Amino acid sequence: GVGRQYATFVGEELPNYIKKTFNLCQNNEDTYIGGLSMGGFGALHTGLLYAQTFSKIAALSSALIVHNIAHMQPNTSDLIADYDYYSLTFGDLEKVEKSDNNPEVLLKKLKSEGKIIPQIYMACGTEDFLLKENREFKTFLDMEKIKAEYVEGHGTHDWEYWNRHLEKFIKWMLQIS
């Protein structure tokens, strides 16, 4: 992305540091990434951008807003942020849909290059204001024949919903029944 290089830090520098410092296994099989809301988007983006680092991605109530903010105009805002924030975070909003800031672009790239796609777990509340975007992304995954664990349930964009799903996605990541 643009702006500060958080994806590089989270996707490359931090995992390498942790593996070396704590003498952990160097393969990606036991390296996961997860997040909630904008962090859910970040987990998908970083997990796909650094697919060689992560084997699994967990994304709860993800802010999959790339299509919403594309073509946004200066001095405008939505429920989350304003044009300036999005421009700093994603770069040229006229080009964001076709950029590596779009998880759909990253998935298509991994597929076309024959690379392994990390396993994906998603959950979103049925009353969450980002439900439509999460459903659309799941539809994209289905159309691309990319398997993902997708869960919906009663709840909004809050910790009450996420707390109910944290244990589920941790068990999924660790493959515990």
Task: Please state what every model-predicted region is.
Residues 1-177:
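Non-catalytic cap/lid and distal C-terminal segments of serine-dependent acyl enzymes
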